[in-house]
C-alpha cells in the first residue's frame, strides 16, 4: 500500500524517500527500486547480543526462503527483546507463545530507527505492530505522521482515534471516514483517498494479462475458484476471545472435495507471502498459485473467490469477481464484507458445497467505480513537506 506512493514520490526527485521494509515486504520494496531499510541496518552488536540470541532461537524453525536469516533474526530478536523490556521475561514468553508476532510493539527499536534516519515526515499504514510503534515514536520526536488506512479499521480504531496518533488519515471511502470521526478522530484530519494498493487492479495491461493467463493454462470454459490462504490465530490479538486455527484448513478441505467432485472446476490455492503451501492432492484441477503469481492478474482470471478475512476479497470485488465469505475467523467482525457489498454471502464451512453449486456458472459482477488513489494520497502527504 505504501510502495505505490513511495515510488511516485521518489520519481519526482524532490525529496529523499526511505522505506522500512520488514521481512517479506523487503522484496516488494527492492522490486520497486526504492531505498530499503531493514532491522539489520539498526543492529548494535554492543547492546543487542541478548536480542540476537532470542532471534536465532525464534528463527530456528522458519523455512521462508523469501526472508534472509539475518533479517529474521534481527526482526524477531529485537522485537522480542523489546517485549521483554516492556512486560518482563515471563510475561513476554507467555504472550509470544499465545500471540506470536501479534505480541510485538517494538517501540524501542523504532525509536532507534527515527533517531538515526531523522525523517521530516513518517508515512505509515494502520498495521498494529511496527507501524503503530513508529507512530508512537514519531509523536515523541515531534515528526508529523500520515497514516494510510487500508480497509475498515474495526480493530485498529482503538489506537487510531487516540489523541494525536497521526496528523492525517487517508481512508478507503466515506463509510470509513464517518466511522473514524464517530470514534473520535478529528474530521479535519480524515481524507477519503482510496487505497493505493488497489490502483493496479484496473490497469488495462493487468486485465489483458488475466485473459492471457486463462488462455495459457487452458482454463477455457472451466469455472475457476481461488482460495487465498490465511493463518488463523488461537486468540484474537486485541480482544479476549478464542479463535479456531483449524478453520482455514477445514474450509480448504471442503473446497478440495467440491473441486474433485466435478470436472468443470479449477481450484487455485494461494499461500500468503512467507507461508508454506498446504499439502494437497496431486490433480490437474488443483493449482498452487504462489507469491510468484501476480495477484492482480490472477484475480482477473478467476470466477469466484472463496475467502475468510483477507484483503484479497476486497480486491476481487473491485475487479468484478464474485466473493463468498467463509465464517469462522476471529476477524469476522473486522471484515464486514457483506455489509459493505463486497461478498454476496457469508456462510459457515459446512455450507460451502451448496453456496458454490448455486453460483458456479454465473457471470462476473459489474465492478464498482473507483478512482486512482495514489495521487490523492500524495496530495495529503505534500501538505507536510
Predicted regions: what is each one?
Residues 1-201:
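Active-site and donor-binding regions of nucleotide-sugar-utilizing enzymes
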Residues 2, 199-279:
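Conserved catalytic-core segment of nucleotide-activated headgroup transferases in glycan assembly
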Residues 24-31, 176-179, 235-236, 274-280, ...:
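Short, charged/polar "capping" segments at the starts of alpha-helices
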Residues 36-41, 287-291, 341-352:
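Short acidic-hydrophobic, aromatic-tinged amphipathic segments that line or gate anion-handling sites
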Residues 109, 113-115, 268-314, 318-319:
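Donor nucleotide-activated moiety binding/catalytic core segment of transferases
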Residues 120-121, 168, 224, 266, ...:
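Structural motif
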Residues 163-166, 187, 311-369:
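Catalytic binding pocket for nucleotide-activated donors in carbohydrate/polymer assembly enzymes
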Residues 203-210, 216, 239, 339-385:
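Leloir-type glycosyltransferase catalytic cores
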